[in-house]
Amino acid sequence: MALEHKTGILPQKAGKGYVSGMMVFEFFSTGMPAIAASAGADFLMYDMEHTGIGFETLKDQMAACRGLDIAPLVRVPTTEGNTVGQVLDIGSHGVMVPMVETAEQARDLVRRAYYPPEGARGTAFGIAHDDYGTAHPIDIMQAANQRTLVIAMIETARGLANV
């Protein structure tokens, strides 16, 4: 399976100027990605922090984005456990993480989001994030690392002081 398309929608579009998108808090219809893409959105940011959206609904949304010219992203509620890896495994092109206050927390976030050598994300192949393909694992990890966007949210005085 060729992985050219897996280098990431956002990096390709950002190189041409700007990107636009929207937060998704409600209305998790599988038609939402197609509507947003036809309206010109480059990404959808699904919010797990402030909504009740779970992994099953997110899996449906990630699948609905597949094949469209739109990148699904997820704001996770925490880096605890394997939430970051799970949302990436189900097809998210990146994560936004709230309340990052220290350089150590930022490093941990990067470690969880990227495959070696950039990070230490656990491996899983032939699943949603690689379109259920059969490419060589090294190629899959490299493509995923190129595609993955990590956003650390600085929301506190402590976080700002540590920037």
Positions of the model-derived regions?
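N-terminal amphipathic alpha-helix/helix-capping segment at the start of soluble metabolic enzymes
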Residues: 1-23, 134-148
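Alpha-helix-loop-beta-strand connector modules within alpha/beta enzyme cores
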Residues: 8-9, 55-81, 85-89, 113-119, ...
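Active-site mouth loops of central-metabolism enzymes
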Residues: 14-30, 72-77, 148-162
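Glycine-rich, proline-tolerant flexible connector loops at the mouths of alpha/beta enzymes
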Residues: 31-33, 38-60
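Glycine-enriched alpha-helix->loop->beta-strand junction motifs that scaffold or abut catalytic
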Residues: 39-43, 89-94, 114-115
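Short beta->alpha connector loops at strand-helix junctions that form conserved
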Residues: 47-49, 76, 97-100
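Conserved anion-binding
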Residues: 82, 94-163
